[in-house]
Design a protein with these regions (language model features):
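Acidic/glycine-enriched edge-of-secondary-structure segments
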Residues: 29-36, 131-136, 248-262
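N-terminal active-site segment of His-dependent metallophosphoesterases
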Residues: 1-70, 375-383, 391, 396
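His/Asp/Glu-rich metal-coordinating catalytic cores
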Residues: 26, 51, 55, 64-231, ...
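Domain-start "cap" segments at the beginnings of catalytic or binding domains
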Residues: 1-27, 225, 231-253
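Accessory, non-catalytic peripheral segments of nucleic-acid enzymes
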Residues: 239-398
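A generic secondary-structure signal
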Residues: 43-51, 79, 268-272
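Conserved beta-strand termini and adjacent loop/short-helix elements that scaffold enzyme active sites
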Residues: 10, 90, 113-115, 135, ...
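Well-ordered alpha-helical segments embedded in enzymatic catalytic cores
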Residues: 40-44, 75, 265
Length: 398
């Protein structure tokens, strides 16, 4: 009869993340984000104690780059001690340097995988329950497959613990690359992977799993972040329960003004948004609220923050006036001339756009500021100007 046990699989805590840009512009918010990283660790500890798990796996990037300070090292060591159950740790490309290993040692219940693949036996009730195999990064630019020498075992349920990049994962880098077919061929029952900041069960039976990072740090890491509670009965995974650890959500939201006549109708689209979330808002559609959106996007951001108790990190205005621009292009009147001229400017070169925008003495004095804008931002300025003129002319004709 096979063994039965429960464990937590987590990864990419990035303890010590500094949020430098946010901290310099909004110190209180920066401190809140820094604290959220440690709150995610606390949530893992609480879940481990609540569920009385048999062990916990940390699949790399526990610390953020060189930010394994005495404080972060101590906080993690204390967390391992509080868990009490065995903890299996591999280090990744961000935390391969371990500066305080001798002066701030981990507790005895922690096992840190070395740079070469090793196996560890997990014994429960005096019987072999699982074999856990893994390795840590030796530097931050490892481009070799760390799983090459891994072999599973028919002796017991086998878990592979690695910080690696699976093919077609969507990552820009190719650190520690491996491929799915290779993993599936190794007689390993559960691959506990880290590195990809996106939660994904890549394959079942055998399981190939990325839990994602424990707390989102930007809009690329949106929605709920957490870890997996895994139940194994008689050497078979019977339950995979995701649980949230990150206290702060990053959300991308699109709000449509089409058919809306009142700002309250726009705000109603935000019902149910969790208080304290970080929001990137895109206003889209066509309607009478276009003018307000373009004239005062900052005011709309502040209104959204007031109503939702969230932080708006960015607001993009992609709305249009409540007229059919395509149809008006063909009318041959002054309004169609404005629309057509605006369309031509949008396709102009950056140099031509700059010359047009900086054609007055006042604008020329601000040219260095305009030079900081991207090509798309310059085109958005032209687009906004076109839409504003169209709206003013349309209102005047009523």
């Amino acid at each position: 009869m096979g063994a039965s046990f429960k464990f937590i699989h987590c990864a990419d805590l990035h303890l010590g993340s500094t949020f430098t840009g946010l901290s310099s512009s909004e110190p209180e918010l920066g401190e809140r984000m820094r604290s959220s990283i440690f709150e995610a660790l606390d949530a893992i500890v609480s879940k481990a104690k609540e569920e009385k798990v048999d062990f916990v796996i940390f699949s790399g990037d526990i610390f953020d780059s060189s930010n394994e300070t005495p404080l972060t090292r101590s906080r993690f060591a204390d967390a391992l001690a509080e868990i009490k159950a065995p903890c299996f740790v591999c280090f990744g490309n961000h935390d391969y340097k371990r500066r305080w290993e001798s002066t701030i040692p981990f507790p005895k219940n922690a096992f840190v995988f070395p740079e070469k693949v090793v196996r560890v036996k997990f014994v429960k009730n005096k019987k072999l329950a699982a074999i856990i195999t893994g390795a840590s990064f030796c530097n931050d630019l490892s481009f070799e497959d760390p799983t090459v020498t891994v072999t599973g075992s028919s002796e017991a349920f086998t878990i592979g613990v690695f910080h690696c990049n699976l093919e077609n994962s969507g990552q820009d880098d190719d650190y520690a690359p491996t491929d799915l077919q290779s993993l599936l061929s190794k007689d390993v029952d559960y691959w506990a992977l880290g590195h990809i900041h996106k939660r994904e069960i890549v394959h079942e039976t055998p399981y190939v799993v990325y839990p994602g990072n424990a707390q989102g740090r930007n809009h690329k890491e949106s929605d709920e972040k957490g870890a997996y509670l895994v139940t194994v009965k008689e050497d078979v995974v019977t339950d995979m329960q995701f649980f949230r650890t990150g206290p702060i959500l990053w959300k991308d939201l699109e709000l449509d003004i089409t058919g809306k006549e009142d700002i309250a109708e726009i705000l109603s689209q935000l019902d149910g948004i969790e208080e304290g979330s970080m929001l990137r808002i895109t206003l889209k559609g066509s309607g009478i609220l276009d003018s307000m959106a373009r004239l005062d996007p900052q005011g709309i951001s502040e209104l959204i923050e007031s109503r939702t108790k969230c932080k708006v990190t960015k607001i993009d205005i992609l709305t249009k006036p409540p007229i059919d621009l395509s149809a008006r292009e063909e009318t041959g009147d002054f309004l169609s001339a404005v629309i057509n001229y605006g369309n031509r400017l949008e396709t102009a070169s950056r140099e031509d756009l700059m010359e047009m925008i900086c054609s007055t003495n006042t604008a020329r004095s601000l040219r260095s500021r305009f030079e900081e804008f991207s090509d798309e931002e310059l085109r958005q300025i032209v687009r906004d100007a076109t839409y504003m003129i169209v709206e003013k002319m349309t209102e005047a004709a009523r």
